[in-house]
């Protein structure tokens, strides 16, 4: 499980989108078009300048298990009340139930964006020379 607290560390910023367009204008324009709603949403509701990239991080973890780290724990999903749909993680083993999930708690945004850009732009990592500066901003 990769929760929103972790995926929210992966933000496709306007600078990253511009860099993507410079490397491959067609793909960059497409990615900008499909993320525009989210760029606007995150700014309007949270004042985040960029698009939080949730699902691609979960997929990237399966391609590179070093992308994220975490712990094995028992996880249950609340099915009623105000917390309906929330994941309840017993990280301390309080309920003494067998772990049924890997809960990812850390990620490496630079490692993610190297893979993300490399795969969607079909470029080798060495061609992504400015990426580190843009991700660490």
PLM segments and residue spans:
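N-terminal acidic, glycine/proline-rich low-complexity segments
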Residues: 1-137
């Amino acid at each position: 499980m990769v929760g929103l607290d972790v995926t929210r560390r992966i933000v496709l910023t306007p600078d990253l989108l511009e860099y993507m367009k410079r490397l491959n204008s067609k793909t960059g324009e497409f990615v900008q078009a499909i993320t525009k709603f989210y760029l606007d949403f995150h700014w309007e509701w949270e004042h985040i300048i960029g698009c939080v990239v949730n699902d691609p991080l979960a997929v990237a973890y399966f391609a590179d298990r070093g992308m994220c780290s975490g712990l094995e724990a028992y996880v249950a999903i609340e099915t009623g009340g105000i917390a309906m749909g929330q994941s309840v993680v017993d990280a301390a083993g309080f309920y003494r139930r067998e772990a049924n999930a890997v809960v990812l708690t850390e990620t490496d945004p630079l490692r993610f964006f190297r893979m993300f850009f490399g795969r969607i732009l079909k470029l080798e990592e060495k061609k992504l020379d400015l990426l580190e500066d843009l991700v660490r901003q």
